[in-house]
Amino acid sequence: MDQNELRELALSKLDQALEALDRGQIDEAKTLIKTMKDEYKHSFDLAEDYVWILLTYIGKTFGEEEVGKASQFRHLINLSQPAQKWSKMKPEDAVRFKALIHRGHHSNITLTEEKDRYVMKLDPCNTGGRMLRMGYDRPPTNLGRTKGAYPWTWGKKNVSYYCVHCAVNEIQSMEKGAPHPTWIYECPENPNDPCIQYCYKRTGDVPEEYFKRIGKKKPKV
């Protein structure tokens, strides 16, 4: 291997693309940018896979109640978490912030506005949705799903251990000061269906069922 190859291997695709632009090589820069996206997605996907694997180990070794505790623990450490940030945002800013997150997740996003809420459709969500579509909960991997129903599973059974954190986000956004869950998740029963998420504009418009399923009461407004 010569020194030029070694140097290029050590450079990020972004740096290589910028160098190509400096040389006026537009097509080369475009190719490098596309490669950069593929490389990042590969690394991101591996990290998300690892989370579900770890939660499965926790559930099988210590009991699935510990999966809920582990998923909530991230909100107890001294780091700013998304649910804490968007709990204090206006709906429009929460939509902008959530779109930023899912662009980083490499999800396939559609955003629409309705009279009382914003709707985000992920087809798929590139984290839990992608892994479910790939069958990680089936043999030979058999990654975990809940056997019981809890507030941190929206009161439902058979929720993937990975997707638990979305219900926890709903709970934590209220516990961090929001009058209602900033983002409300409708995870599909069929993994081939999209994940739908709602950001309501006003607390009064949020159906009471969305509070009950996470063990909360709808405030009077």
Region spans (language model):
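N-terminal accessory segment detector
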Residues: 1-195, 201-221
